């Protein structure tokens, strides 16, 4: 047969133009494509041999071999898979919409497709070789046939096919690399090894690298032994019952890169309309870059044991960015470059599954290893809280995972919402909480009445807590109540109610005087029912921005943050307030006391003083007067 010259299909010519101009973001991926195609061919031969044993003689080792020749700038990938005949070469390499694998699946539509292990659902990866090769030769012999063929192209608009002797079934692809530094790099032994181990380390068949012969001291050529490059086990593909705990921990060190042990993990295999595997780890320590906006996060994505990408963010929400692990899909379609995911539906289903498994693993740790979970929460709980304002699907699961300090917990101990509700005393209707500065919130004057009543208050001091509580409005049938806002509805005796009403009238004059002096800073002055030992405190109106939110927005550099006027509550039983009431009734000047009370209320809640010098001067005058 004479050499036949043929033209590529129009779509192929367009594809070649894209490839030559680097459609892929990373040129090294061409080798991943060739190895994947070789694995396809091996799968086909193995499968067809089940019905025709002559296609795979006993003892045949299905494998992939890689050779380099630096002097000739050649890279060769050989497999002993199904091979191709002339028609296959024209249809598979001359057109784009009819990949060999695609036709193979179509021909088997009435058979058990689940037994066919195929990856080549894209049909265009082969052409990526022209990013690095100026010429390509494909020498092949199809299983069950005797005539071999040679396909040749320089990546222009044409290709040639000729008959060529070949004794071994399979395909040998030779790349004549371009005369540029990037392309020549693909004859480097370490480079080839690195790429194969990175992308194809878990491929089912052995991938063997053959080093170039080197001269010894005598000038004689020495042939080095071949080296298998993919000796790793796809742990996530194994049954969970067959994997030991130490194996899980060792694999975490491979993918986690933090040198520690995971807090817990989840290993699953989903079957049905979609089939995929996942092995996800929850680290015990926060990654060093957990708060960097541009930090990479996500899972490693594989398709048919072929590595596709690191840090696949589509499989995890930002509030689970600390999770490490692997997802492998049987059904995930990828675009031409295999780097950008196409099917949102499939990705969404996998994502939902992974999120559920992570939350289940955390809940299991919380239920069975409470101390361990407490330690984990202190490391990464603040990230998990982001889930309350970033999603609406998993709020119930997240609520059960929350942990808080409270007025009833010892130092270092935390309480869950379940525990809080179970130990609520009779008469308590709501879940009370207070947000503030970490050092000040524990001694905030607003806690005094709650402690006296025996009501536990959750204490929050993370910057994200304000955002979280905007979505966290109830737990079961219990609503949350911020004790720094509005009135507190305590159950009161008739005598207590009468005393409160009486105090409003008795202290009306003092409240009005304080309001006049502090009018620029204070919305209202009123008698408090929440104070026991302190003279005063600041309360936020139900419709106003909290002091904590105001401070946080200013710290974030937001300009023109509106100043919220607060409510100053005074304690009618405190000696200072009694003394000031007497002054007000006697029409005496309150002097520096209003500024002193306001400043004390600010400091007690952890807020900064608007004018520290003025406050110090007022306190100094009062102390000096008391010393005389």
For the regions a protein language model found, what residue spans apply to each?
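GHKL (Bergerat-fold) ATPase N-terminal catalytic module, capturing the glycine-rich phosphate-binding loop
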Residues: 1-186, 194
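GHKL/Bergerat-fold ATPase module in large chromosome/replication-associated machines
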Residues: 118, 139-158, 178-185, 190-628
């Amino acid at each position: 047969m004479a050499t036949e010259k043929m033209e590529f299909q129009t779509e192929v010519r367009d594809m070649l133009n894209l490839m030559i101009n680097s459609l892929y973001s990373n040129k090294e991926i061409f080798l991943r494509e060739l190895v994947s195609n070789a694995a396809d061919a091996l799968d086909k031969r193995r499968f067809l041999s089940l019905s025709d044993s002559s296609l795979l003689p006993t003892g045949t080792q299905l494998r992939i071999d890689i050779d380099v020749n630096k002097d000739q700038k050649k890279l060769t990938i050989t497999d002993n898979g199904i091979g191709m005949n002339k028609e296959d070469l024209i249809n598979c390499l001359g057109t784009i919409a009819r990949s060999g694998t695609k036709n193979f699946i179509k021909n088997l539509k009435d058979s058990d497709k689940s037994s066919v292990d195929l990856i080549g659902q894209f049909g265009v990866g082969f052409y990526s070789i022209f990013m690095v090769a100026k010429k390509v030769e494909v020498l092949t012999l199809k299983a069950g046939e005797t005539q071999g063929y040679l396909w040749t192209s320089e990546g222009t608009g044409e290709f040639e096919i000729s008959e060529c002797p070949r004794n071994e079934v399979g395909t040998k692809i030779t790349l004549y690399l371009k005369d540029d530094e990037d392309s020549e790099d693909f004859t480097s032994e370490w480079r080839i090894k690195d790429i194969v181990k990175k992308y194809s380390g878990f491929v089912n068949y052995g991938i063997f690298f053959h080093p170039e012969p080197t001269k010894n001291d005598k000038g004689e050529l020495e042939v080095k032994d071949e080296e298998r490059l993919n000796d790793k086990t796809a742990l996530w593909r194994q049954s969970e019952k067959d994997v030991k705990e130490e194996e899980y921990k060792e694999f975490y060190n491979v993918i986690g890169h933090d040198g520690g042990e995971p807090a817990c993990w989840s290993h699953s295999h989903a079957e049905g309309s979609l089939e995929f595997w996942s092995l996800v780890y929850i680290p015990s320590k926060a990654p060093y870059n957990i708060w960097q906006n541009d930090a990479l996060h996500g899972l490693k994505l594989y398709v048919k044991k072929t590595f596709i990408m690191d840090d696949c963010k589509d499989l995890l929400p930002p509030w689970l960015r600390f999770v490490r692990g692997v997802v492998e899909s049987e059904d995930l379609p990828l675009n031409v470059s295999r780097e950008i995911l196409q099917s949102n539906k499939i990705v969404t289903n996998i994502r939902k599954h992974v999120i559920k498994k992570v939350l289940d693993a955390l809940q299991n740790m919380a239920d069975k290893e409470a101390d361990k979970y407490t330690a984990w929460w202190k490391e990464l709980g603040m990230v998990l809280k982001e889930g309350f304002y970033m999603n609406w699907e998993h709020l119930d699961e997240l609520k059960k995972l929350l942990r808080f300090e409270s007025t009833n917990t010892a130092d270092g101990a935390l309480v869950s919402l379940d525990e809080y509700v179970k130990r609520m005393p009779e008469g308590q209707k709501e879940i009370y909480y207070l947000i503030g500065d970490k050092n000040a919130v524990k001694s905030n004057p607003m806690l005094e009445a709650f402690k006296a009543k025996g009501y536990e208050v959750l204490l929050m001091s993370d910057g994200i807590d304000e955002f979280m509580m905007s979505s966290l409005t109830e737990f079961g049938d219990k609503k949350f109540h911020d004790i720094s806002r509005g009135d507190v509805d305590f159950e009161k005796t008739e005598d207590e109610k009468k005393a409160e009403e009486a105090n409003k009238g008795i202290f009306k004059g003092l409240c009005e005087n304080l309001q006049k002096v502090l009018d620029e800073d204070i919305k209202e002055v009123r008698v408090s029912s929440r104070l026991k030992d302190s003279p005063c405190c600041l309360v936020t109106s139900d419709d106003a921005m909290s002091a904590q939110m105001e401070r946080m927005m200013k710290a974030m550099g937001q300009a023109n943050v509106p100043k919220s006027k607060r409510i100053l509550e005074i304690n009618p039983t405190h000696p200072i307030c009694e003394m000031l009431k007497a002054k007000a009734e006697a029409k005496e000047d309150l002097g520096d006391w209003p500024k002193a009370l306001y400043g004390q209320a600010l400091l007690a809640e952890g807020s900064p003083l608007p004018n520290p010098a003025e406050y110090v001067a007022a306190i100094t005058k009062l102390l000096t007067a008391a010393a005389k």
